[in-house]
């Protein structure tokens, strides 16, 4: 989903396995999970948040994009996780595609697969 320049991700964890989405949102519940910020210094941002007492929850690479990310559990203070995401042209292209698809959306077919 998109609201102006803000992308809104609606995430529904499936399966039984533990994951970062269920760490703060119990199964069967609906809640706000995270805010995401672009960063040019992922390691530095992680180190800064960890030095403030926050726990690193997950790291990874967005498939096919070259972008790396981290989730830091800031929920004890902020009430939600914080995602840090490095910039890449491919990930920017994905976000631009989502924004463009939202411009003339008529409200039908809200659940769609990407790719």
Indicate residue ranges for each PLM-predicted region.
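Glyoxalase I/VOC metalloenzyme domain signal
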Residues: 2-55, 66, 73-115
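A short beta-turn/loop motif at secondary-structure boundaries
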Residues: 62-64
